[in-house]
Design a protein with these regions (language model features):
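Acidic two-metal-ion nuclease catalytic site recognized across multiple nuclease folds
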Residues: 1-3, 149-171
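Conserved non-catalytic scaffold segment of RNase H-like nuclease domains
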Residues: 1-107, 111, 126-139
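Active-site flanking residues adjacent to catalytic metal/cofactor-binding acidic residues
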Residues: 8, 115, 143
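Amphipathic alpha-helical interaction segments
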Residues: 97, 147-150
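Short, flexible loop segments at boundaries between secondary-structure elements
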Residues: 112-125
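Generic alpha-helical structural context detector
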Residues: 119, 130, 150-153
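Short, charged, surface-exposed loops that flank catalytic or proteolytic processing sites
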Residues: 140-143, 161-162
Length: 171
């Protein structure tokens, strides 16, 4: 199974998927975190909905001088392009955020293989972190990405153990 993967999380400034205001990214290789990125991003027009500020606590003042996504993409792309990428609720949210934001800035969406810990566990991130005793500062992108990476690591260990047990029982 996958020995290396990137866990990602995006926070948005409003209801538009292309309004990314924070990127959290964790690279895991052989069960060890080898890289982490937490980047505040200025969304288009630095425009926020108040209810989104209430969720993640990021304000227009914090991103007023932050780079826009097209400038930070070169830092992020190597962790995504041709990689195994995991996000919690990735197919409903994070992967769409990435694609729509890249389209907004006229950038190509790279090939990657997506995985979703919500689809694997069928529960929300906060509940899973409590269940598995994983530290979480919910809606802070790096913390969410780190938690997602830990959940995926647990899944991979469980999957590999089940596969090994099936191989052993066939002998």
């Amino acid at each position: 199974m996958h020995k290396s993967y990137t866990a990602i999380d995006f926070e948005t400034a409003q209801g538009k998927r292309w309004s990314i205001c924070q990127v959290g990214l964790v690279r895991v290789e052989n069960e060890i975190i080898t890289a982490q990125l937490s980047i505040l991003v200025q969304p288009p027009d630095n425009y926020y909905w108040n209810r989104f500020i209430d969720i993640h606590g990021i304000t227009p003042e914090q991103t007023a001088n932050a780079p826009t996504f097209d400038y930070v993409w070169q830092q992020i792309e190597p962790f995504i392009k041709n990689q195994q990428v995991v996000a919690h609720n990735g197919f409903a949210f994070d992967f769409h955020c990435l694609k729509q934001t890249l389209e907004y800035y006229g950038l190509a969406t790279p090939e990657f293989t997506g995985h979703c810990t919500y689809r694997i566990y069928k529960d929300n991130l906060a509940s899973l972190c409590k269940q598995y005793n994983i530290s979480l500062n919910h809606h802070e992108a790096l913390s969410d990405a780190r938690a997602c990476g830990e959940l995926f690591k647990i899944h991979l260990k469980t999957y590999n153990n089940e596969r090994n047990n099936k191989k052993t029982s066939r002998k």
